Amino acid sequence: MRWLLTSSALLVPAAALVRPDGVGRTPALGWNSWNAYSCDIDADKIVTAANEVVNLGLKDLGYEYINIDDCWSVKSGRNTTTKRIIPDPDKFPNGISGVADQVHALGLKLGIYSSAGLTTCAGYPASLGYEEIDAQSFAEWGIDYLKYDNCGVPTNLTDQYTYCVPDSTDGSNYPNGTCVNLTDAAPQGYDWATSTTAKRYQRMRDALLSVNRTILYSLCDWGQADVNAWGNATGNSWRMSGDITATWSRIAEIANENSFLMNYANFWGYPDPDMLEVGNGNLTLPENRAHFALWAMMKAPLIIGTPLDSIDTSHLTILSNKPLLTFHQDAVIGRPAYPYKWGYNPDWTFDPEHPAEYWSGPTSSGEVFVLMLNSEGEVKTRSAVWEEVPELKDRGTKKNSKEKKGFKVTDAWTGKDLGCVKDKYEVKLQAHDVAVLVVGGQC
């Protein structure tokens, strides 16, 4: 089965899950507890993160969701009478609603986590079969965002067929994005929106729509069951791969996979390459920078996953980049940046180690963002040639003219005015680093 999209792919005319007040129209911005603390969470850590989002200026930049991930409930089971999930009284002595009150008082929103199975990934009670009860609980507690995972699925509710997700988390090899050893592929024309996986997620969607509160719905089915085909009608974002880790190899692999899904991203629905690892692990500063820039240009949800009360200034600077956040949240243009040249590889090569290196995307202000990545492990030169950038090649000087095409260019990282750049912009990049250019008017 071939998963790889082609260069001729057009925008997908999928039905979108449109919510009131613009909720989910642009990609989510926020913070989540998992990459920072895993299961070691409590009310104090969540409220501290919320306060830091305000104190560090992140709220002013648009970050708004403070999301509680797995391990927030009593692990032994539900209330035997009401069947409701019980918040852990040791971790959350005032319940989830108590945390919601504090988060809302800061002008922020609160998110929570469950799974479309019997248990969560950490073994806590999940929502399969209790969708309406849990949606009502979430609404009553003041929840604004639900991350819905794919763990704890009973064997009688697994899919009849297997969809090809070319991701290393299952240990297989995927030559150029294909699943050569897939033995139970769906027949041609099969509608994955009717699959058991899709129905599990649709049940929670319907439950959330039935309550008197707008809750952003973030699907986390790891790309299974061709979620790209039905995710936009079901949720506001959908995971397209297995979990991220704080390693460059994994970040590059996910960026490569997601680069072939950009035609699915637009207002109200976004493929999700997982939460940010900026500030975590042993990532170099260039790798942190490249990670954030790629996610922002792909218009992925930008969900911070590091302890904010101890964040390094250099990492905060990356997360606070105004030009990239402005591109990411453009209220007029919903499409993300697209790769226009692979650089290290021939175009349209599926390579987990070397994702597409040249990206561009338009803005409502008329500027064009151009990203150049050095996917190699040593210093390399990269060049943005204006005639190769789709949004620029038809502007200005005619192709047959001897005069070189020039544009006003600004460095998105430093804010430095690079002046009138003729023909191309060339830069030396450290291993796994990026340059992001804001290309303005002709000069």
UniProtKB/Swiss-Prot annotation:
Keyword Oxidoreductase in annotation: no
Record's subcellular location: Secreted
Statement: the UniProt record of this protein carries the keyword Secreted: yes
GO molecular function, one term: alpha-galactosidase activity
Glycosylation sites: 79, 156, 176, 181, 212, 232, 282
Location of the active site: 149, 243
GO BP: any one term: carbohydrate metabolic process
One GO CC term, this protein: extracellular region
Catalytic activity: Hydrolysis of terminal, non-reducing alpha-D-galactose residues in alpha-D-galactosides, including galactose oligosaccharides, galactomannans and galactolipids
CDD domains (alphabetical): GH27
The enzyme's E.C. designation: 3.2.1.22
Family: Belongs to the glycosyl hydrolase 27 family.
Designated name of the protein: Probable alpha-galactosidase B
The encoding gene: aglB
